[in-house]
Amino acid sequence: METRAFWTTLLLVLVAGSSCKAQEFVGLSPSQCMVPANVRVDCGYPTVTSEQCNNRGCCFDSSIPNVPWCFKPLQETECTF
């Protein structure tokens, strides 16, 4: 019974995750792609898909019109002491 609950939960998570295609951050941390719309640096071209954008190492977010949807991520900084 526990196995069935596990697979049901996994299926729900996968379905919920795949239903939201506005933001894609494959291989990047979500914090790297939290770039304000007014400072996004274009990383694609007008008809770029989220997959093509991610293959370039860039973030994809089509939820805001009239700004680059494929844009360069923020650089993560390392703390040095």
From Swiss-Prot:
Q: Between which residues do disulfide bridges form?
A: 33-59, 43-58, 53-70
User: Looking at the UniProt record for this protein, which Gene Ontology cellular component terms does it annotate, in alphabetical order?
Assistant: extracellular region; extracellular space; secretory granule
Keyword Disulfide bond found: yes
Pfam families according to UniProt: Trefoil
Compartments it resides in: Secreted, Extracellular space, Extracellular matrix; Cytoplasm
The entry's keywords: Cytoplasm, Disulfide bond, Extracellular matrix, Secreted, Signal
- What does the UniProt function comment say about this protein? Involved in the maintenance and repair of the intestinal mucosa. Promotes the mobility of epithelial cells in healing processes (motogen).
User: Quaternary form?
Assistant: Monomer. Homodimer; disulfide-linked.
Name of the protein: Trefoil factor 3
Please name the source species. Answer: Rattus norvegicus
Q: Which gene encodes it?
A: Tff3
